[in-house]
């Protein structure tokens, strides 16, 4: 008996020693996230920061950083996935009500494994409760060259009946610094990407939305963190973070009693106490983050490179320029007028004509936004030959054809609503609130998923030459009640988004090379999960070039230019067509304008600008972006793109509202080859106009251009210059 006891004790000691020595490292070329198992088997974050070069240093990292404090084991360190109802007094990563009503959970380390994935390494850590058959798997994918990490979690169980999840975070990250500065982004219709910087103090700050169909409107699903000082462009320690979830999201930033910051990205638990059945797996959204000691610019470029290579649909492919009819015609068009616009698109030089809203429904024709949504057949009175006739006309004109859809929505005045009122999110016993005169389909319902998939599949099956979809989503969820979920409404918000994923996965599997643009009341859907299925997104319905400069500056922190749709329109006609075009050319250029209203010189200009853009596209869409002069810090803005081989670059310079006799500073470029000689040539000039820039046509070394720079700003409102360096 004595020997048995000694053997058991030895085994326990061995187990404890094994746990104590267990170190898990998630690493890029510049960043380390290090976790360590405590003697009692709990998992703690012991380090997140610059990559440590000496492996022996990891042994010196302590899990019990607050060992002198009172309290239980969780309070002594930074538990990787803190639970609720047990020892931690701050915001948890996960909270569960077990099948028997118990609200406590303790997670212990079981195992970890690493495997190679495209571009990086995935680490999977398994945690388990010792009392209840509950398992949490933590996933981390590290992309070494891009210095980007994405993280998500999976929750499952084998209890006798369903458990309730009321917190379900993607991950939990800890930081220790003297000060923390959060820049989050608020928004509204036509006011996307408005930054607001706050120093975080002891306590909790929450950024969230409750919109249902989109992540963004009042708040955006991305943020910046500056450590010790507000995040800067080219210096200082920063983190950029974003969550991939086109629904209700929540960022929690909590500074505890000892000054440590925990960052918790998650689905918003609002109205979402989720019933999880035994054997099912609850998968959280991906949280993507990049850290840098050299400011936001470097972190952004890393995110851009990662996104193009590993996340965005056709991220390394080309993008189509297009002419949209919306601001030209609105709902008032017919087949003949569209055929003329297709000819205009060809003459302009763009790749495609995009037909916007108003082409569908017969019993209740789509004459305005009060009717027709849900009835996706061409209106015979407008388009007697339907989509096939439009595709034929586009071919005849020599351009591709794309089409607008809003398949997640329905008007009460539609045949679909008459046939399937049970497919609609709607409170049956209350007055109905309409958002843009429409309602949202309940895509948590598999039958509705089949219907939405069938819209795209039918169009593509009957018209395989359709080259592009603009997928809109103009309404948030109102009248919150899912006929499909009945008594289980807590699952609705989350299952609705998963239903959208199911539809998009089916579309992508069948049509993997089909470009699609996200649109949602402007820029309501800007997230990296949806971009797995879409090639680009619409930044904002605000196409005033002044406002677009600010919006595009903000969004470029997190998204590469090739994902950001920017159209030349008639908004703010007081600005020149050149200024409007130059602003849009710094992203994914397209047009939504009445070309026939342009003067002869303006028309010649936009034709040449399209050709110039085609030449510059490799730099803008694939190159490295450098934000040089912020519009938020003065009256001007400048950015440059540099090709990967540093042989070519393009500089965009904009004068917004300069002050009287304001002294002009040179713009110092970045990212060039210091030893290379670059010839500077201004492009996008009006017909017959010569460049008035002293630098035009001259040669400069990259070193000169980066240290001394070029005089490209003026004192005139709404002036722009585009310079190519090669």
Identify the residue ranges that each predicted region occupies.
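Active-site neighborhood of glycoside hydrolase catalytic domains
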Residues: 384-386, 418-420, 424-578, 588-593, ...
């Amino acid at each position: 008996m004595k020997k048995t006891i000694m053997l058991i004790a030895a085994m326990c000691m061995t187990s404890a020693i094994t746990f104590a020595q267990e170190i898990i490292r998630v690493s890029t070329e510049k960043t380390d996230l290090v976790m360590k198992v405590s003697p009692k088997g709990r998992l703690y974050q012991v380090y997140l920061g610059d990559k440590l070069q000496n492996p022996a240093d990891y042994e010196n990292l302590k899990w019990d950083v607050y060992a002198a404090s009172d309290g239980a084991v969780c309070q002594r360190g930074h538990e990787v996935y803190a639970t609720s109802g047990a020892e931690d007094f701050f915001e948890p990563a996960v909270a569960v009500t077990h099948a028997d009503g118990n609200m406590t959970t303790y997670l212990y380390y079981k195992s970890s494994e690493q495997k190679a994935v495209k571009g990086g390494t995935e680490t999977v850590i398994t945690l388990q409760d010792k009392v209840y058959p509950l398992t949490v798997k933590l996933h981390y994918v590290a992309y070494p060259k891009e210095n980007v990490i994405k993280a998500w979690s999976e929750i499952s169980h084998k209890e006798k009946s369903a458990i309730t999840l009321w917190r379900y975070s993607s991950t939990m990250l800890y930081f220790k610094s003297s000060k923390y500065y959060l820049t989050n982004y608020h928004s509204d219709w036509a006011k996307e990407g408005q930054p607001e910087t706050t120093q975080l103090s002891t306590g909790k700050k929450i950024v969230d939305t409750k919109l249902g169909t989109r992540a963004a409107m009042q708040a955006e699903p991305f943020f910046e963190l500056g450590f010790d000082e507000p995040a800067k462009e080219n210096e200082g320690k920063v983190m950029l973070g974003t969550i991939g979830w086109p629904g209700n999201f929540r960022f929690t930033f909590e500074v505890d009693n000892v000054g440590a910051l925990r960052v918790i990205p998650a689905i918003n638990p609002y109205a979402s106490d989720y019933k999880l059945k035994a054997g099912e797996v609850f998968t959280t959204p991906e949280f993507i983050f990049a850290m840098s000691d050299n400011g936001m610019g470097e972190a952004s470029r890393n995110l851009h490179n990662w996104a193009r290579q590993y996340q965005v649909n056709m991220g390394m492919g080309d993008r189509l320029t297009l002419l949209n009819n919306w601001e030209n015609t609105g709902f008032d068009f017919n087949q003949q007028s569209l055929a003329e616009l297709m000819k205009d698109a060809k003459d302009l030089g763009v790749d495609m004509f995009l037909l916007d809203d108003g082409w569908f429904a017969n019993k209740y024709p789509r004459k305005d936004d009060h009717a027709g949504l849900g009835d996706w057949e061409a209106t015979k009175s407008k388009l007697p030959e339907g989509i096939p006739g439009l595709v034929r006309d586009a071919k005849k004109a020599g351009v591709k054809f794309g089409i607008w859809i809003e398949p997640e929505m329905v008007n009460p005045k539609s045949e679909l609503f008459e046939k399937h009122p049970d497919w609609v999110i709607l409170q049956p016993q209350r007055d109905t609130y309409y958002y843009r005169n429409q309602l949202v389909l309940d895509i948590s319902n598999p039958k509705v998923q089949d219907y939405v998939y069938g819209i795209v599949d039918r169009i593509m099956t009957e018209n395989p030459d359709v080259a592009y979809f603009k997928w809109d989503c103009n309404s948030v969820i109102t009248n919150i009640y899912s006929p499909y979920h009945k008594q289980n409404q807590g699952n609705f918000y989350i299952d609705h988004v998963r239903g959208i994923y199911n539809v998009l996965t089916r579309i992508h599997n069948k049509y993997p090379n089909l470009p699609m643009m996200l649109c949602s009341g402007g820029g309501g859907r800007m997230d990296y999960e949806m971009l797995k299925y879409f090639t680009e997104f619409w930044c904002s319905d605000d196409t005033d070039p002044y406002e677009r400069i600010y919006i595009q500056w903000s969004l470029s922190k997190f998204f590469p230019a090739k994902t950001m749709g920017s159209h030349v329109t008639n908004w703010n006609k007081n600005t020149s067509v050149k200024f409007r075009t130059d602003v849009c050319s710094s992203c994914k250029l397209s047009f939504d304008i009445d070309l026939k209203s342009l003067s002869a010189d303006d028309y010649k200009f936009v034709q040449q600008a399209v050709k110039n853009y085609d030449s510059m596209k490799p730099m803008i869409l694939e190159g490295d972006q450098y934000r040089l002069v912020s519009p938020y810090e003065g009256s001007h803005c400048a950015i440059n793109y540099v090709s990967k081989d540093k042989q070519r670059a393009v500089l965009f310079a904009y004068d917004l509202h300069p002050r009287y006799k304001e002294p002009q500073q040179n713009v110092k470029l970045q990212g060039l080859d210091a030893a290379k000689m670059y010839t500077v040539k201004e492009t996008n000039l009006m017909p017959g106009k010569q460049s008035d820039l002293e630098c035009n046509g001259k040669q400069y070394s990259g070193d000169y251009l980066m240290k001394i720079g070029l005089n490209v700003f003026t004192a005139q409102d709404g002036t722009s210059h585009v310079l190519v360096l090669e």
